[in-house]
Design a protein with these regions (language model features):
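ASCE P-loop NTPase motor core, strongest for the SF2 helicase catalytic module
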Residues: 1-120, 355, 359-477
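Conserved Helicase C-terminal RecA-like lobe
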Residues: 185-206, 228-460
Length: 477
């Protein structure tokens, strides 16, 4: 918690804190934020969130970082100090690393020793990496995994020694333990780094019919047809997220990056569906029914000859709430959108688009039917068995506390309900983005090893990735 940490060190009054999604407020002068030139030091936590240069928030952050300082103060020069914090600086593509460097470096006049032009320096690494990934994709049977791993390591070693080491202040656990001054400071404060054991997989089994359904479903989710890359694909088109790609004539000119947008959205939703299937059958069923509903809603738009494309107003949400199309159009116009840029007719689309929507709806209906008939949940059964007979063994868990992470909020809710009902435990706390603020105090009392006022009211916390970064949960062994 940055606010608490700055307060602890007595420097909170010198700082302002802002979330990634609100950077535009500084640019546009909204709220109580200072002018972008008034900041002397910019600290970016979890900097990997800015490795993609296409998002608007990247541009906002880069502008804030590179706007000259208005007041020099005791530190001379107009350039700001920029600190990017990341636990895994090399866990990025070369393109991502270049984007991060360009948040605080001049592209063609870098201050990094031995490197003047960053894009030129990175171009060969990016080319080698992309070539390596293409070759790896063609290796269908993973016969050259060791070769690819070796070549990737060699590539990143070059980037590390020539660039990353020169701009990185390392503070790894080994670094701190092996420097005498740091080690003494740890000893004086009675701080001990625990030895982290490697991950331990728990393998659950699917019976014959469920196993077949799982893998046939995975094929439908991933075998997306494509005229060039996968012409014989039998899976979902994800057409609901590709509307702009199939605009034609004058309508298409309004979306010059249509292919890029649809490719990106298709990839995101495909990964989302696969992750939901692997997370829990409950979460996957919910996603299936949602995907079917929004696909059928778009087909209904064609029936009314009014297809709305307006990402800024969340058309899907409005349809879920029962809004008529005319009301959604009026709402879009009220928000400053032009009707001619928002509402399209049947003839504005390639006829193949509606066919793809109907094919998706057919596949999704069948998947919904098949998964609605599944009552067993072997993953849950194995997990409950481990909870009852292993996870709270004093030999491996002397504190009797447990943290359970899931990428899916639906899985968090499902798991919380199942464990409370079946194990009759009342010490289970669920934490997601929607309730984190309200539960912060009790969470810290029960799980933060540094918190003065400790409690054992809750011994299990089930959470989404909202607690995966920057939160002390060390009472959970």
């Amino acid at each position: 918690n940055w606010t608490d940490t700055f307060k602890l060190f007595g420097i909170k009054r010198y700082a302002q804190f802002i979330s990634n999604g609100s950077l535009n407020k500084i640019i546009e002068g909204e709220g109580n934020f200072r002018e972008k030139g008034e900041y002397d030091l910019v600290i970016v936590d979890e900097a990997h969130n800015f490795r993609g240069a296409t998002a608007g928030r990247y541009d906002d952050l880069q502008l804030i970082c590179k706007t000259p300082r208005i007041n020099e103060g005791l530190v001379k020069g107009h350039h700001k100090k920029v600190m990017l914090l990341s636990a895994t600086p090399l866990n990025n593509r070369p393109t991502d690393l270049l984007n991060l460097l360009l948040l605080f470096q001049n592209a063609r006049y870098s201050t990094i020793e031995g490197i003047q032009n960053l894009p030129v320096t990175f171009s060969s690494w990016i080319e080698d990496y992309d070539k390596l990934m293409r070759e790896r994709k063609l290796d269908k049977h993973n016969e050259r995994n060791a070769v690819f791993a070796k070549r990737t390591d060699e590539l990143y070693e070059q980037i590390r020694t020539q660039v990353i080491d020169k701009v990185t202040v390392r503070r790894t656990r080994n670094n701190i333990k092996n420097v005498p001054a740091y080690k003494k400071d740890l000893d004086d404060q009675h701080i001990v780094f625990p030895d982290i054991l490697p991950p331990k997989e728990l393998m659950y089994e699917l019976n014959g019919g469920l196993n077949d359904l799982f893998y046939s479903t995975m094929a439908i989710l991933t075998d997306t047809p494509h005229p060039e890359d996968n012409p014989t694909g039998k899976g979902l088109h994800y057409a609901r997220y590709r509307a702009v790609e199939f605009l034609q004539g004058e309508a298409r000119k309004k979306y010059p990056t249509a292919l890029h947008i649809s490719t990106m959205l298709t990839g995101i939703y495909r990964v989302h569906m696969v992750k939901r299937l692997e997370s829990s059958f409950y979460a996957f069923r919910r996603s299936l029914h949602t995907f079917l509903r929004i696909t059928e809603d778009m087909i209904k738009m064609f029936d009314q000859n009014k297809v709305i494309i307006a990402p800024d107003i969340n058309v899907k949400d409005k349809q879920t709430k029962g809004w008529e199309l005319d009301r959604i159009i009026e709402y879009a116009v009220e928000k400053g959108l032009k009707e001619e840029d928002t509402v399209f007719k049947d003839e504005d689309f390639n006829e193949r688009f509606l066919e793809m929507l109907k094919e998706d709806a057919k596949n999704l209906k069948e998947l919904c039917k098949q998964w609605d008939e599944v009552s067993e949940d072997p993953k849950l059964e194995l997990f409950i068995d481990k909870l009852e007979h292993e996870f709270f063994d004093k030999e491996i868990n002397p504190t009797g506390k447990l943290v359970i992470f899931s990428e899916s909020v639906d899985t968090v809710n499902y798991l919380t309900e199942q464990l409370q009902n079946r194990l009759h435990r009342h010490d289970i706390l669920d934490v997601c983005a929607s309730n984190r603020t309200n539960r912060q105090d009790i969470l810290r009392k029960c799980f933060d090893a540094n918190y003065a006022e400790q409690s054992d009211e809750f011994n299990i916390v089930i959470t989404s990735d909202v607690l995966a970064e920057g939160v002390n949960l060390h009472r959970a062994n």
